[in-house]
Amino acid sequence: MGEELSVGFRFYPTEVELLTYYLRIQLGGGNATIHSLIPILDVFSVEPTQLPNLAGERCRGDAEQWIFFVPRQEREARGGRPSRTTGSGYWKATGSPGPVFSPDNRVIGVKKTMVFYTGKAPTGRKTKWKMNEYKAVETASVSTIPKSGSSRAFDRRPTEAYAIERNLPSNGVETSSRATISTSPETSHSGGNQVDLPVNATTITQSISDMVDELSQPFWEWEQMNWS
């Protein structure tokens, strides 16, 4: 895993690949190779601008997307609402979670989108940071929400480019412990300050910050995750 990739090659798995391959492996215990690509991180315990430097070795230099496995919080495991507040702001869900489908039209996960706001709720200021959270499902029912694993991905591609959202099944992945992908719709900060953008393939810019509200994220079942 240490060799350099040729220019133009990136670790950019699709939603189906995150849910049916990477998240499944993590739910089965994970391994060092997978964690070098998608590390385990409580994305809500750090600021969005820190995420690029905490990403896996194949995403660390990426200016568009970062993916993490996010452990389930104790309060969430007890049936409570997870804390999405950081020192400088909070993550706010936008829209409703949606199913993610496999190529043969089966629901394989759930996708939920969040946008980062600076300040305190409900008067925070929306930024271009976007997070897509995916959870895997064990059945083909769209209403089924996975119990253990999720992943989050952060992307900073321009909102226009990210507007073409993909639908994921209930067993989605969030680049974080839950396969979670963070995205930042602003493109103006793609330069040396790429760290300020979310893992999603969007760039963070004030001019397109309003477009982030249309994103949504799915969740995985935490009971099935092995975080050791």
UniProtKB/Swiss-Prot annotation:
Enumerate composition-biased segments (Low complexity).
80-89
- Domain NAC per the UniProt entry, residue ranges: 5-156
Among PROSITE patterns, the record links this protein to: NAC
Gene Ontology molecular function terms on file? DNA binding
Its main subcellular localisation, reduced to a broad class, is: nucleus
Q: Does the keyword DNA-binding apply?
A: yes
Q: Which GO terms describe its biological process?
A: regulation of DNA-templated transcription
**Location in the cell:** Nucleus
UniProt keywords (A-Z) are:
DNA-binding, Nucleus, Transcription, Transcription regulation
Stretches with biased composition (Polar residues): 168-193
Query: Region entry Disordered: which residue ranges?
Result: 77-96, 166-197
This protein's domain notes:
The NAC domain includes a DNA-binding domain and a dimerization domain.
What name has this protein been given in UniProt?
Putative NAC domain-containing protein 61
User: What is the primary gene name for this protein?
Assistant: NAC061
